[in-house]
């Protein structure tokens, strides 16, 4: 460990200022010795504080407000973000550890890249004195020389950067980003659909607590498509009823099942005898009881003359072939 530097070797701040000693666990004995010597030699108007550098870098605490003098008792190389955190126009004293002469060149380069100014003469061979720039600056980075400003190019102030507007990217990339179809599938994935995927789901409400749920009817000004579904179902039901009504029944209860003897209105069937007189005789073609011949293609009596209700009709075997 190098010989301690007496506190009188450092330039004492003129006026009420704070001296901050930043140390680390690697150099804890030197940190404690320097902090004790500075406190013993500090004037009453000056304040001496000690802090570990990792608390400053982790934002666990902040540096005291200027005017400020900082003593760095740290191993080399210094943390890269420490020099950027030092306030402007602040004098720092870097206490060089022993056996670190090979790293002094990199230390001077790092300080110069952050625009730190050396203070000569140095307090001692093991201590370097520098002053931070008056305005915070970024590390110098080599770049191409900018063209000379012309009449149409505004001159920017020091430290200011012109606003760079983002240009529109490739339109094809934007279209591919929002595309629904994949370019890897020629038909956009339609070939992957099964017939079950293409089937429209039935509008069926499940039972709730064992009770059927009433179906919701479409509004008068429906726009959700429920009205169209209801119209389609009504058309299918009406077509099924019309298909069922095409059946033509003759009077006579020989081959008619019992459940069809009480046919509803609109279908010709076998009614009870007490209601036959009141029943309105109808048929699918509407001509069987109008004195016209049988002309329906599906009628088994096609081509025969008309008969009266209740008349026994006899069909020969030749007519049935």
From Swiss-Prot:
Residue segments, region Fe-S binding site A: 203-224
One GO cellular component term noted in the UniProt record for this chain: mitochondrial intermembrane space
Family stated for the protein in its record: Belongs to the anamorsin family.
Role noted for this protein: Component of the cytosolic iron-sulfur (Fe-S) protein assembly (CIA) machinery required for the maturation of extramitochondrial Fe-S proteins. Part of an electron transfer chain functioning in an early step of cytosolic Fe-S biogenesis, facilitating the de novo assembly of a [4Fe-4S] cluster on the scaffold complex CFD1-NBP35. Electrons are transferred to DRE2 from NADPH via the FAD- and FMN-containing protein TAH18.
UniProt-recorded Gene Ontology molecular function terms: 2 iron, 2 sulfur cluster binding; 4 iron, 4 sulfur cluster binding; electron transfer activity; metal ion binding
Location of this chain's protein in the cell: Cytoplasm; Mitochondrion intermembrane space
Keyword annotations: 2Fe-2S, 4Fe-4S, Cytoplasm, Iron, Iron-sulfur, Metal-binding, Mitochondrion
Composition bias, Low complexity: 125-158
Domain of life the protein comes from: Eukaryota
Chain positions covered by the region annotation Disordered: 124-168
Protein name: Fe-S cluster assembly protein DRE2
One Pfam family recorded for the sequence: CIAPIN1
Region called N-terminal SAM-like domain, residue ranges: 1-161
Binding positions for [4Fe-4S] cluster per the UniProt entry: 285, 288, 296, 299
Cited HAMAP family: Anamorsin
Species name: Cryptococcus neoformans var. neoformans serotype D (strain JEC21 / ATCC MYA-565)
Required cofactor(s): [2Fe-2S] cluster; [4Fe-4S] cluster
Subunit composition and interactions: Monomer. Interacts with TAH18. Interacts with MIA40.
InterPro entries: Anamorsin, CIAPIN1
Organism taxonomic ancestry: Eukaryota, Fungi, Dikarya, Basidiomycota, Agaricomycotina
Region (Fe-S binding site B) location: 285-299
GO terms of biological process kind: iron-sulfur cluster assembly
């Amino acid at each position: 460990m190098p010989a301690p530097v007496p506190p009188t070797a450092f330039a004492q701040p003129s006026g009420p200022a704070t001296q901050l000693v930043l140390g680390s666990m690697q150099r804890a004995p030197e940190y404690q010795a320097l902090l004790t010597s500075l406190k013993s030699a500090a004037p009453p108007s000056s304040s001496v504080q000690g802090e570990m550098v990792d608390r400053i870098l982790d934002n666990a605490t902040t540096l005291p407000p200027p005017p400020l003098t900082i003593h760095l008792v740290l191993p080399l190389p210094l943390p890269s973000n420490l020099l950027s955190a030092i306030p402007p126009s602040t004098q720092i004293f870097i206490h060089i550890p022993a056996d670190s002469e090979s790293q002094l060149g990199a230390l001077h380069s790092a300080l110069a890249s952050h625009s730190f100014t050396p203070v000569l003469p140095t307090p001692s061979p093991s201590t370097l004195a520098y002053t931070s720039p008056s305005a915070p600056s970024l590390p110098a980075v080599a770049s191409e020389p900018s063209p000379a400003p012309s009449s149409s190019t505004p001159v920017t102030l020091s430290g200011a950067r012109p606003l760079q507007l983002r240009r529109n990217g490739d339109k094809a990339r934007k279209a591919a980003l929002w595309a629904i179809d994949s370019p890897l599938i020629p038909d956009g994935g339609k070939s992957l659909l099964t017939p079950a995927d293409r089937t429209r789901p039935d509008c069926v409400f499940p039972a709730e607590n064992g009770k059927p749920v009433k179906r919701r009817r479409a509004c008068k000004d429906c726009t959700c498509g429920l009205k169209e579904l209801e119209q389609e179902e009504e058309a299918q039901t009406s077509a099924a009823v019309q298909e069922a009504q095409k059946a033509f029944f003759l009077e006579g209860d020989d081959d008619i099942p019992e459940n069809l003897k009480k046919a509803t209105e609109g279908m010709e069937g076998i009614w009870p005898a007490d209601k036959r007189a009141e029943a309105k005789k109808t048929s699918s073609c509407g001509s069987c009881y109008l004195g016209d011949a049988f002309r329906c293609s599906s009628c088994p009596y096609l081509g025969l003359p008309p008969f009266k209700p209740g008349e026994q009709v006899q069909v020969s075997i030749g007519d049935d072939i």
